[in-house]
Amino acid sequence: MKPTAIFLMGPTASGKTDLAIQLRSQLPVEVISVDSALIYKGMDIGTAKPSKEELALAPHRLIDILDPSESYSAMNFRDDALREMADITAQGKIPLLVGGTMLYYKALIEGLSPLPSADENIRAELEQKAAQQGWAALHTELAKIDPISAARINPSDSQRINRALEVFYITGKSLTELTEEKGEALPYDFVQFAIAPQDRHVLHERIEQRFHKMIELGFQAEVEKLYARGDLNINLPSIRCVGYRQMWEYLQGDYAYEEMIFRGICATRQLAKRQLTWLRGWKTPIQWLDSLQPQQAKETVLRHLDSYQKG
């Protein structure tokens, strides 16, 4: 019999953390974060990282594990999450995975085809080609090989263009083809919940309010500190995080303060829309919860889990 795991998914600003804290007070669970932004140290305000008080009530694994200069893949997450889940299960508890990075959940459930290690010779050739023709030309080349990846990658994002082309030159397969090849399935029985306000206008209002709250809490100073380091740039996954990118571009002088706020809110709403699109197309059953009914949401999870465990 496989051990049980609980997934608590949902768009940004939907109330996942609050519900996770409530669940931990009533269930033998330990929380694992499923969030590609919370992994970074020194990025607290703009990621809406749980506060010290919240973490005291419900410690989260897989937050604050990397410096913003480092990259982290869905494969990295799967390895780390499986290790943490095994540790939690060994303690006789249930892993409660909480977050909105849907690609991480997909990787965890379905497994991933391992991607090849970097080839410095190929990378050097691509760098040389880019120096002569520009990264936009290499992006055009990528679009012919792998239009799906090219559509997701900004033409100026040299790091991701290089990697996508490198993978193709090493394997003869596109990055999209390789990531669609399934690996080892998840060795857990998992119950899935998704929390969101039933009224999308409420979610949009929450996102706007949260962004303004981040500004009040010192988000600009947080990004200024990262900017002043000198070793970070806008092509890094950390700085591409929603909100950070817009504040970074403002600090670079790309646009005015009010424009930065507008763009930050719009980008966060677009993120929420993408997360909801993922969830609506999810292949395995999800129990939906209403953010506006937190007590009912908690009771639904407890009731559903009780009946699930009884079989």
UniProtKB/Swiss-Prot annotation:
It catalyses: adenosine(37) in tRNA + dimethylallyl diphosphate = N(6)-dimethylallyladenosine(37) in tRNA + diphosphate. Residues 35-38, 159-163, 240-245 are annotated as: Interaction with substrate tRNA. ATP binds at G10, P11, T12, A13, S14, G15, K16, T17. GO terms for biological process: tRNA modification. Substrate binds at T12, A13, S14, G15, K16, T17. GO terms for molecular function: ATP binding; tRNA dimethylallyltransferase activity. Its cofactor is Mg(2+). The record marks T101, R123 as: Interaction with substrate tRNA. Disulfide bonds: none annotated. Keywords: ATP-binding, Magnesium, Nucleotide-binding, Transferase, tRNA processing. It is an enzyme of class 2 (transferase). Its EC number is 2.5.1.75. Catalyzes the transfer of a dimethylallyl group onto the adenine at position 37 in tRNAs that read codons beginning with uridine, leading to the formation of N6-(dimethylallyl)adenosine (i(6)A). Belongs to the IPP transferase family. Monomer. This is tRNA dimethylallyltransferase.
